[in-house]
UniProtKB/Swiss-Prot annotation:
Residues binding ATP, per UniProt: G10, A11, G12, K13, G14, T15, R128, T137, F138, Q195
Keyword field contains tRNA-binding: no
Source organism (scientific name): Streptococcus agalactiae serotype V (strain ATCC BAA-611 / 2603 V/R)
Protein name, entry field: Adenylate kinase
Gene: adk
GO biological process, one term: AMP salvage
């Protein structure tokens, strides 16, 4: 089974990806892991990626696409199938993935989209606070400290609501064309992500069993 998982930051995509890998035995292909492995193994694309990263520059699409292609061509993919996580990030990368899969004789079986209302995600992501003395992390709503005094806690700049909203807006703008592309191919299953982790996975599992 060859899958793609999508979802906004804070939707719980990483948690569900880990559960899918555990339950269905597919190879988990996350962009971060892929880059690290390609650079460690000094593949052609890995060396290219490292040259950009070392200069503090963004890795161009063609290099990212090349690293994905290298990984998808490995033997375990034909045996186990894959779960792509964190790629494609742009519609151009989605088109490149289509071409790569066709070239390798592979087919995408489904796209799992973990849906959570952005307003809920802002609450999830912007509630994080850190104790100034101990460095411990808490959440204002979901895991509040027992003896909360505002002056004892601070919030990281990228956890502030306005920053979180900007980040979500960018992700929505990038993600919508990709989802639309796969919807036209009849591949997308939307999963309600604003429920307990076990309930989300029950819905994911049901959708994937129907694909088999």
């Amino acid at each position: 089974m060859n899958l793609l998982i999508m979802g906004l930051p804070g939707a719980g995509k990483g948690t569900q990806a880990a559960k899918i890998v555990e339950e269905f035995g597919v190879a988990h292909i996350s962009t971060g892991d892929m880059f690290r492995a390609a650079m460690a193994n000094q593949t052609e694309m890995g060396r290219l990626a490292k040259s950009y990263i070392d200069k503090g520059e963004l890795v161009p699409d063609e290099v990212t696409n090349g690293i994905v292609k290298e990984r998808l061509a490995e033997d375990d993919i034909a045996e186990k199938g894959f779960l792509l996580d964190g790629y494609p990030r742009t519609i151009e990368q989605a088109h490149a993935l289509d071409a790569t899969l066709e070239e390798l004789g592979l087919r995408l079986d489904g796209v799992i989209n973990i849906k959570v209302d952005p307003s809920c995600l802002i609450e999830r992501l912007s509630g994080r606070i850190i104790n100034r003395k101990t460095g411990e992390t808490f959440h204002k709503v979901f895991n509040p400290p027992v003896d909360y005094k505002e002056e004892d806690y601070y919030q990281r700049e990228d956890d502030k609501p306005e920053t979180v909203k900007r980040r979500l807006d960018v992700n929505i703008a990038q993600g919508e064309p990709i989802l639309e592309h796969y919807r036209k191919l009849g591949l997308v299953t939307d999963i309600e992500g604003n429920q307990e982790i076990t309930e989300v996975f029950a819905d994911v599992e049901k959708a994937l069993l129907e694909l088999k």
